[in-house]
Structures are given as structure tokens and as C-alpha cells.
Amino acid sequence: MYPDKDVIHQFLSLLTEPWKECSPKGQLDLRFLANGKSASTAQFSDDQLMDATDHIVQLNINKLNAYVCINPVAEKPLKAGKGAKDEDILRAHFAFADCDEPGSAERLKSSALPHDFSVVTGTRPHLRCHYYWQFDQPLQNLAKWSVIQAGFAKAYGSDSCVK
């Protein structure tokens, strides 16, 4: 499987579009992982989406999986190899369900409220998707966001670590 640059850019654009209405806008926090390798991280502002896209593509080609923090993080230096922590998150613009377990993607798609967009993260050995719902207004109460995320995990069998 080869990374699709256009799809990656579209995904990053969808995530960061609502940030433009907020102050501070924040930045993207990216993490890259692979078995037997140290974690790698990178941060990009919303006006550096092509740079972020190119970075993701290059590291995917080098067999690292990319993980994007869907919420904007504070614009501050982070320790090398360390991604943003909960206290670095500025606010939430989306709820999402990480459906990587067998049957969870199909279960959510057939019974949840319509999602705003989704990303297929794999098809073998089974369908794996992430589903996204945009809030009408940014959610400042991140404890409430965690409750929403836990609700998705319980109802649909999505990843319970996403909170």
C-alpha cells in the first residue's frame, strides 16, 4: 500500500479548517511509530499542511505509521520524540471513533448518527475506519470530550484508549 498524498492532505485540511475561527489556532501534532523503532514526532501549523502531508508520506514510505492528534495543541516546543500531552490540547472540534477491532466499523456505520467524514485505515484482515463528527462549536471542556469518546467506545467497540 502506498500513501495517497491527496487523501492525506484532504484529511488534514478537514481537521484544521475549524481552527481558523479560533484564537489561538494551535498546531497539528503528528506521531510516527513502527515496531522496533523509537517514536518520532512533528508539529505543523495550519498553514503548513503541504509540509505536514509531505512529511507523513515520506515516513509512511519508510514504514512508519502516522497518528494525527485531531485536536489543536498549544504552540510550544515539545521534547524530542515526545508528542503532546492532554494538558497541551487547546479544545476539541471533533468527536471520533477509532474502529480497528473486527466488526466495530460495520457496527458503527449501521447504527450511529451520520458522520461528517471517515478515513479507511485498513481493509485486511478486516475493515478498519475512523469516523468523525464535527461539533457545532469548539468544545472547551475536554473532560466532557473524554466522556463522549468513552461513550463511542462502549457503544460501538471502538478504541477505548481514545480519550
PLM regions: where:
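Signature for HUH/AEP ssDNA processing cores
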Residues: 1-129, 133-147
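Flexible helix-coil linker/hinge segments at domain or subdomain boundaries
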Residues: 150-163
